[in-house]
Structures are given as C-alpha cells and as structure tokens.
C-alpha cells in the first residue's frame, strides 16, 4: 500500500497572538465603531491594514511585522470587507481575549480562506476579495511639519468635544457642517486652530510643540473628521505628527505610531463656502453684491408684491403697518377688519367681491325668517369661536353682527338625545379690572 504524498500547505499569513492582543486592546474602542466602509488588507510584507473611507477623510491602521508572520513570500495580497454576513464586524471578532489562533491562506485569487480558533471552538470560512481597492500612502513632501505632544492632543480634544455633540430637540433648521481652520505662521513659529464660532486655540514652539518645517499656510477641514482623527491618534498616548501636504491637492496628514501599529489619517481640504465666517471679504461685501437675503430682502419683496396688484395708493405701507393678527396678509378672514367694515374681512384688496370673511353686506337685508332658514341649513358649520371673526377660509357668510345669533344657546338642537342648558341672559357688562 503506497503512502499518499502529503500536499504542501498554501502560503499562510498568521498572527503573533501576544503582541497582536496587546495592540488590538488599545484599538478596541476605535475598531468597535468601524462600519461597512472599511476594508481589511493582508500583505506579504507581512502587514495587516484597516482602511476606512469617509467624506473628506481616509483613516488607516497598519499592524506591522511585530504582530504577524508569513510562511511563504509568494502570498498574494488579499483585501476583504470588514463587514461580513453572519459575523458582522470582522476585526472586532479578532479583538476577543479568547482567540487562540488566527491565520489567512492564499488558495484563490478570488477569495481568502480564514481560520479562527478559541477554546472548544473552531471556525473556517472563505471571504470574497475586493478588487481595485487602493491603499493611501504617506507622502514625504510636506510644506508644514509639526509634532504635538500627547498633552496637546488631549487639550484639543477637550476644546473641540463640546462643539461636536449633537444637540437634541433643536427647533432651528440644521446648520451646515462645522469646520476648523488651521493657521500656521512662520515667524515666530505658531499653529492656531479656529472654530466656526470664533473660538481659537494657539500653540507656539516649546517642549510640547516642535516645528520641523514651517510655512505660512491655511487649511480648512471638517470639524467632526478632525475630532475623530485626534481620537484615533490618542489611543497610542504618544506624540502626534501633523503635516500639510500640497503635492496635488491640499491634504492634512495626522498620524501617531508605536512599536506595534501606526494610525494615519488623511483629511482633504473643505472648500470655503459663501457665508463662511472665515471668508471675511465675502462677509464684508455680501450686502453690496447680493442685495441681502435676510430681513431687508423679505421687506422689499413684500413691497414689490404690493406694487404688482394696483389696489390703491399706499397699499405697501398699509401692509407693513398692519399688525399680523388673525386676519394676516391676504385670505386670513376677518381678524384684521373693523366691526362695520364693508369689506367683510381680509380677503382680496378689491371692494366688489370679498373672499376672506365674505358676505358681510348680504345679511343686512335678510328678515328674521330668512335668517332662521339659513341657520337651519348652515348650522353644522357653526363653530364655538364664531364670534371671533371667522377662522381660515371664511365663516360661511357670517360677520360680527350675525355671529352672536348663530351661537345663541337658545337655538341649539331640541332633539331628545341632546343635552339642554338653561340660558340666563346677563344684562350687565363685564368690566376688566
């Protein structure tokens, strides 16, 4: 009986569990928040790279060869999604303290075979590879290079934190995304951080801040991205490097590293918008160039609207001087009119046909019988607030003189099912104390 030839193992990349667990525990709070927009790349260097892509920001965590080893240099790079079916956050699973074995095998160009082991548990699965995923690389050419001590990073987090919290039950319209402007001065060397509300924090050269390359520059980035960047770098509790790269587009590079892993963040510049407090030239000339978009613009539009309908002289002045009561502007219905006004309410500006309160002139010539017949027909339209002058679209032809008649308690329904109340007229007028 011939002995079968043992097949050679495919190229395998595995974790050195002791250093990897030390590194992953520091990053556990960051990895827990990773979502679908994160990929995991295994390289034959060996290294393991997590890359998260957000709007105007790319974050990268690289585990170096201190945490990994490889059996064969022919191992082909593999990139998979961090969010996997049934498992959820893949990298968060590897942060478990119960993990006893983890390795990736190169058996196909289209997938990666992954094995994870724990006491009394073994799991193997294949995950489809993601193709065409580029890894962002650091550029050595930078116009500004500043090293910040961990204490400076902590001060920035305390300063920015209250401005990034989402306020609940805010009645105002949502505001644009907040930004932070970073100014670098060459003489004397200084770096200043300015928020949208005008609050600023400045650091000069000392034992906490070191300037290796200085140039007068300004960059504007999203506040939430910058805050998350500082949180990512703070896990090392080591100095943080801040650089401004201007090779193709202006880019803010923020990184921190230790002996096991490196945290890198690439923030693209947020374009300056009109109305930005940082754009002082626009703020100073906005009223001259655009004519204003606030209160003055609305007043002029009302005046122009009054001029389009030639309803008589001084209409726009009447509109501006009229108190915005129940009648309102146009079609409100009687709240702004007087008791004996022939217009019958605040409808159109014409006198021939009134559309707001409506029908004030037609009730004067009706007899009591006709009023009673009309009341029987329109009694279902009667509201308890009828004496107030009619609500939104006219009160069914009622004015202030006839409102008391329709709301008289003696004219309530006499059916057996209804509840009747005795009406005692009070001749005395109530006086307001």
From Swiss-Prot:
<dbReference type="GO" id="GO:0030337">
    <property type="term" value="F:DNA polymerase processivity factor activity"/>
</dbReference>
<keyword id="KW-0597">Phosphoprotein</keyword>
<feature type="compositionally biased region" description="Basic and acidic residues">
    <location>
        <begin position="360"/>
        <end position="376"/>
    </location>
</feature>
<dbReference type="InterPro" id="IPR046938">
    <property type="entry name" value="DNA_clamp_sf"/>
</dbReference>
<keyword id="KW-1113">Inhibition of host RLR pathway by virus</keyword>
<comment type="function">
    <text>Accessory subunit of the DNA polymerase that plays an essential role in viral DNA replication and acts by increasing the processivity of polymerization. Forms dimers that binds to double-stranded DNA and UL54 specifically to stimulates long chain DNA synthesis efficiently. Plays an important role in maintaining the structure of viral replication compartments by interacting with host nucleolin/NUC. In addition, suppresses innate immune responses through effects on host IRF3 and NF-kappa-B.</text>
</comment>
<dbReference type="GO" id="GO:0039693">
    <property type="term" value="P:viral DNA genome replication"/>
</dbReference>
<feature type="compositionally biased region" description="Gly residues">
    <location>
        <begin position="325"/>
        <end position="336"/>
    </location>
</feature>
<comment type="similarity">
    <text>Belongs to the herpesviridae polymerase accessory protein family.</text>
</comment>
<dbReference type="Pfam" id="PF03325">
    <property type="entry name" value="Herpes_PAP"/>
</dbReference>
<keyword id="KW-0945">Host-virus interaction</keyword>
<keyword id="KW-0899">Viral immunoevasion</keyword>
<keyword id="KW-0946">Virion</keyword>
<keyword id="KW-1092">Inhibition of host IRF3 by virus</keyword>
<keyword id="KW-1100">Inhibition of host NF-kappa-B by virus</keyword>
<dbReference type="InterPro" id="IPR004997">
    <property type="entry name" value="Herpes_PAP"/>
</dbReference>
<dbReference type="GO" id="GO:0006260">
    <property type="term" value="P:DNA replication"/>
</dbReference>
<keyword id="KW-1090">Inhibition of host innate immune response by virus</keyword>
<feature type="region of interest" description="Disordered">
    <location>
        <begin position="274"/>
        <end position="433"/>
    </location>
</feature>
<protein>
    <recommendedName>
        <fullName>DNA polymerase processivity factor</fullName>
    </recommendedName>
</protein>
<dbReference type="GO" id="GO:0019033">
    <property type="term" value="C:viral tegument"/>
</dbReference>
<feature type="compositionally biased region" description="Gly residues">
    <location>
        <begin position="385"/>
        <end position="398"/>
    </location>
</feature>
<dbReference type="GO" id="GO:0085034">
    <property type="term" value="P:symbiont-mediated suppression of host NF-kappaB cascade"/>
</dbReference>
<dbReference type="GO" id="GO:0042025">
    <property type="term" value="C:host cell nucleus"/>
</dbReference>
<comment type="subunit">
    <text>Forms homodimers. Interacts with host SMARCB1. Interacts with host NCL/nucleolin; this interaction is important for the organization of proteins within viral replication compartments. Interacts with UL112/UL113; this interaction is necessary for efficient viral DNA replication. Interacts with UL84. Interacts with the uracil DNA glycosylase UL114. Interacts with the DNA polymerase catalytic subunit UL54. Interacts with host IRF3. Interacts with host RELA.</text>
</comment>
<dbReference type="GO" id="GO:0003677">
    <property type="term" value="F:DNA binding"/>
</dbReference>
<keyword id="KW-1017">Isopeptide bond</keyword>
<keyword id="KW-0235">DNA replication</keyword>
<feature type="compositionally biased region" description="Gly residues">
    <location>
        <begin position="344"/>
        <end position="359"/>
    </location>
</feature>
<keyword id="KW-1048">Host nucleus</keyword>
<keyword id="KW-0832">Ubl conjugation</keyword>
<dbReference type="GO" id="GO:0039548">
    <property type="term" value="P:symbiont-mediated suppression of host cytoplasmic pattern recognition receptor signaling pathway via inhibition of IRF3 activity"/>
</dbReference>
<keyword id="KW-1194">Viral DNA replication</keyword>
<keyword id="KW-0238">DNA-binding</keyword>
<feature type="compositionally biased region" description="Low complexity">
    <location>
        <begin position="298"/>
        <end position="307"/>
    </location>
</feature>
């Amino acid at each position: 009986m011939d002995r079968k030839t043992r097949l050679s193992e495919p190229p395998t990349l595995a974790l050195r569990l002791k250093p990897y667990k030390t590194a992953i525990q520091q990053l556990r709070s960051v990895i827990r928040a990773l979502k679908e927009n994160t990929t995991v790349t295994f390289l034959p260097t060996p290294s393991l790279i997590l890359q998260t892509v957000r709007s105007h920001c790319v974050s990268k965590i690289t585990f170096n060869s201190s945490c990994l080893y490889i059996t064969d240099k022919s191992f082909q790079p593999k990139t998979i999604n961090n969010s996997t079916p049934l498992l959820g956050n893949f990298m968060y699973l590897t942060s478990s303290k119960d993990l006893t074995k983890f390795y990736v095998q190169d058996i196909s160009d289209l997938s990666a075979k992954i094995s994870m082991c724990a006491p009394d548990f073994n799991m193997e699965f294949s995950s489809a590879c993601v193709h065409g995923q580029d890894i962002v690389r650091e550029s050595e050419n930078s116009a500004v290079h500043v090293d910040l001590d961990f204490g400076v990073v902590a001060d920035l987090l305390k300063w920015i934190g209250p401005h990034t919290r989402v306020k609940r039950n805010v009645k105002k319209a949502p505001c644009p995304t907040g930004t932070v402007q970073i100014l670098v001065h060459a003489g004397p060397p200084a770096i200043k951080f300015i928020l949208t509300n005008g609050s600023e924090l400045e650091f000069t050269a000392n034992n906490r801040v070191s300037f290796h390359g200085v140039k007068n520059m300004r960059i504007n980035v999203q506040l939430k991205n910058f805050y998350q960047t500082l949180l990512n770098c703070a896990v090392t509790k080591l100095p943080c490097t801040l650089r401004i790269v201007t090779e193709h587009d202006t880019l803010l590079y923020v990184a921190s590293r230790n002996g096991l892993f490196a945290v890198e963040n690439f923030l693209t510049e947020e374009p300056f918008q009109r109305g930005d407090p940082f754009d002082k030239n626009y703020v100073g000339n906005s009223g001259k160039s655009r004519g204003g978009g606030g209160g003055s613009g609305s007043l002029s539009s009302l005046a122009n609207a009054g001029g389009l309908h030639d309803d008589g002289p001084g209409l726009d002045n009447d509109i501006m001087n009229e108190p915005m009561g129940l009648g309102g502007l146009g079609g409100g219905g009687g709240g702004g009119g007087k008791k004996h006004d022939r217009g019958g309410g605040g409808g159109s500006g014409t006198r021939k046909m009134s559309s707001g309160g409506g029908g004030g002139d037609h009730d004067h010539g009706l007899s009591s019988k006709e009023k009673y017949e009309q009341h029987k027909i329109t009694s279902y339209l009667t509201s308890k607030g009828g004496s107030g002058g009619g609500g939104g679209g006219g009160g069914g032809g009622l004015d202030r003189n006839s409102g008391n008649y329709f709301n008289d308690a003696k004219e309530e329904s006499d059916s057996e099912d209804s509840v009747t109340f005795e009406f005692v007229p009070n001749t005395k007028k109530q006086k307001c104390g």
